[in-house]
Amino acid sequence: MNPEFWQARWKEKRIGFNQPKVNPLLIKYFSDLKMATGSRIFIPLCGKSIDMIWLANQGFDMVGVELVESAVQEFFAENNISYTIKAHDKNSNIKCYQGQLSGQTIALWVADIFMLRTNDVGRVDAVYDRAALIAMPAELRPQYSQQVIDLSQNAHQLLLTLNYDQNERAGPPFSISHEQIQQYYSAHYQIQELEGKPSTLNAAPEMTVTENVWLLNKP
């Protein structure tokens, strides 16, 4: 990952990927994961996503990871959630912000996701990936997808991706083809496409984009 790129995006408020409302595809399809109340959801590259507020209000705990500390600070400040900060036991550059909302625990690691270990993240019952895989350049995606599988101990995933002509725009967000989904995940999951719908990019509204929703279940 390129820390300087993402630090600059947040500092300059070029965060069109941060949605002001809960993602309607999360609301529509989260129940397909069949998670019991109290389950713990892992959200990679979580930013300050308001989706986490919705998940807490549905009765789920969360653990997230975000490279940019100011994004995590803004999440807690903008939602009036008190928090504590826990230092990492071995890496002084990693810390965890933790707070409570609607009786649910939200623990957000400030870290490069590739630096985290399974015991840092703890128990994971499902993964919600809305903006992480599509933020990764092609050369990092195999490593990223395997890292999430390892950190979550092969938990089910609800995955949102975009598919468009990558020649028209460099990204991020990057285009992910059906073939690439198979490449990254078929060794570990049964893959089901729940929806593919026309969508747009804030930075390029004239482009033809398909937003895909994937359910990744353990065999």
Curated annotation (Swiss-Prot):
GO terms for biological process: methylation; response to metal ion. InterPro entries: SAM-dependent_MTases_sf, Thiopur_S-MeTfrase_Se/Te_detox, Thiopurine_S-MeTrfase, TPMT. Pfam families: TPMT (PF05724). GO terms for cellular component: cytoplasm. Its EC number is 2.1.1.67. Transmembrane segments: none annotated. It catalyses: S-adenosyl-L-methionine + a thiopurine = S-adenosyl-L-homocysteine + a thiopurine S-methylether. Keywords: Cytoplasm, Methyltransferase, S-adenosyl-L-methionine, Transferase. It comes from the Bacteria. It is found in: Cytoplasm. One of its GO terms (molecular function) is thiopurine S-methyltransferase activity. S-adenosyl-L-methionine binds at W10, L45, E66, R130. Belongs to the class I-like SAM-binding methyltransferase superfamily. TPMT family. PANTHER family: THIOPURINE S-METHYLTRANSFERASE (PTHR10259:SF11). This is Thiopurine S-methyltransferase.
